[in-house]
Amino acid sequence: MKKEIKRDDVNVIEKDFGNNNSIILKLFKKFGEDSFFIQTTVTDIIVLWIDGSLLLALAKFLLTINNPYNMLFDLYGIDERMRLYKHNLPLSHFSVVYHFISINRNSDIILKIALLEEKLSLPTLTKLYPNANWYEREIWDMFGISFENHPNLIRILMPKTWVGHPLRKDHPARATEFDPYVLNKYKEDIEMEALKFKPEEWGMKKNKQSKYMFLNLGPNHPSAHGAFRIILQLDGEEIVDCVPDIGYHHRGAEKMGERQTWHNYIPYTDRVEYLGGCINEMPYVLAVERLAGIEVSQRIEVIRIMLSELFRINSHLLFISTFIQDVGAMTPVFLAFTDRQKIYDLIELITGSRMHPAWFRIGGLAHDLPKGWNALLKEFLLWMPKRLLKYINVALKNSILISRSKGIAEYNKHDALLWGVTGAGLRATGINFDVRKKRPYSGYQNFDFEVPIGAGISDCYSRVMLKLEEIWQSLAILKQCLENMPEGPFKMDHPNTTPPHKVRTLQHIETMISHFLKVSWGPVLSSNESFKMVEATKGINSYYLISDGNTMSYRTRIRTPSFPHLQQIPSVIRGNLISDLIAYLGSIDFVMSDVDR
């Protein structure tokens, strides 16, 4: 395969990839330089195109080297057929992207495989990385790319009766592009039949000595935390096996990114994980700013952090209180909603909205901080510590809660990495990986805070207690924001993001023309690929954006933490009781919009 950077130009490799160049040299030595095409992007990640025949050998190599790339962070497809600016990339109609992370190295590597329409097929990675299962099903569902020897390659987000593959460029993006939908008795029977669970399709076989029951938990069960179904194979109350069934909340968030301008997509980011608010806006605007070459002021960075930590506390309070409710105590829910109201009052004062502010902007913020924000924040910082002690004393030290959650739904660091677990679930296993510390963004490196780490085993109780500790750390960050808010602009003076100053419009007609085009059409960003991850409320959230020199994204990939977390459920809960499953679901901290997108 053609190379963009030659092996003997080590200086170029070091300049582009810094400390990560060692893995490139190892790959060159093992597989030969001609096996790779190095793509230059603004992702700050090694991006290598390879032939599909090398995939299994390369993945095994990455998984078994010293300090291995033992997390398959993301896996997704791209329809390359309408892409204008390919920059001499390998010929492809579609491509499949594998994003690996080495926690020990704090390093990423992305492998891309070019596919032609005549052969849309690759070998499955499920035997090496078990979390590839759902990602490969999603690629089949969205693009029609198959994976050889996959254990059960069926749709995952779309209904079984759906026709077509939605993320292909020739698939309609709007409801008005379809024929009018009519639901008659015949169609209803077909849809209901498609929802029936058939155990034999999943390799679930009856034992002659045991009479198993198959039970639907959800998609409207209160302990399922949303439109989510788990099919349980039961021997009495013991869970022999289970199959999580998702997709009921799918709204096509990635497809929408292909139809909205760079600015207009911001409100959609809030709704991917509807409790995270501004945290969800952060990776998107940072990725777009990287594409546009925009650097923001320190004031913007600190305000973004302040809003993110307010939403983090807000989400954690809901998680902790509803977990306690799931195992049998009601009082903390009422305490939490009182505390969350105080946070929403502050968020509403600053942004004008509550749950979905859509307040971050490319290159800044919607507006500056209002008068009185600091007094309200100070009041909250005085209030919250006393309330946290109440949660601990009233519920989290309760012997019944501890017995219902400690030692329940356990997994270790090896399993967490192979299943793609991030956030508190990963840190509870003893792995110290918080993006705010390991890969600081928006100025987090200037703040003094600790990352709570578990003792080595992640169980229901440790996951909850880590989230509680994270609230204390978020309060410490907010205090620093209050005491050290820098001066400066709330929006950068950049033609792609900000209207020109009045004085310039009276002197230079070009500024008016530029303003008219940027407002009416949207900003045009140069062709490139960008990536940004953040430590969100439920784990690592990231955006991979492809610009094709247009006013909107060519491909918007949203990696959410809850998707792999739900995929892990069967491996953790087999052999446990139904009551343990309820506690486990409550300890994951997920919302279905984050899973289904």
Swiss-Prot record:
It comes from the Bacteria. Its EC number is 7.1.1.-. NDH-1 shuttles electrons from NADH, via FMN and iron-sulfur (Fe-S) centers, to quinones in the respiratory chain. The immediate electron acceptor for the enzyme in this species is believed to be ubiquinone. Couples the redox reaction to proton translocation (for every two electrons transferred, four hydrogen ions are translocated across the cytoplasmic membrane), and thus conserves the redox energy in a proton gradient. It comes from Buchnera aphidicola subsp. Baizongia pistaciae (strain Bp). Residues 211-597 are annotated as: NADH dehydrogenase I subunit D. It holds the Pfam family Complex1_30kDa. SUPFAM superfamilies: HydB/Nqo4-like, Nqo5-like. NDH-1 is composed of 13 different subunits. Subunits NuoB, CD, E, F, and G constitute the peripheral sector of the complex. It is an enzyme of class 7 (translocase). It is a peripheral membrane protein. Gene3D superfamilies: Cytochrome-c3 Hydrogenase, chain B, NADH:ubiquinone oxidoreductase, 30kDa subunit. It catalyses: a quinone + NADH + 5 H(+)(in) = a quinol + NAD(+) + 4 H(+)(out). GO terms for molecular function: NAD binding; NADH dehydrogenase (ubiquinone) activity; NADH:ubiquinone reductase (non-electrogenic) activity; quinone binding. PANTHER family: NADH-QUINONE OXIDOREDUCTASE SUBUNIT C_D (PTHR11993:SF45), NADH-UBIQUINONE OXIDOREDUCTASE 49 KDA SUBUNIT (PTHR11993). In the N-terminal section; belongs to the complex I 30 kDa subunit family. In the C-terminal section; belongs to the complex I 49 kDa subunit family. This is NADH-quinone oxidoreductase subunit C/D. The gene is nuoC.
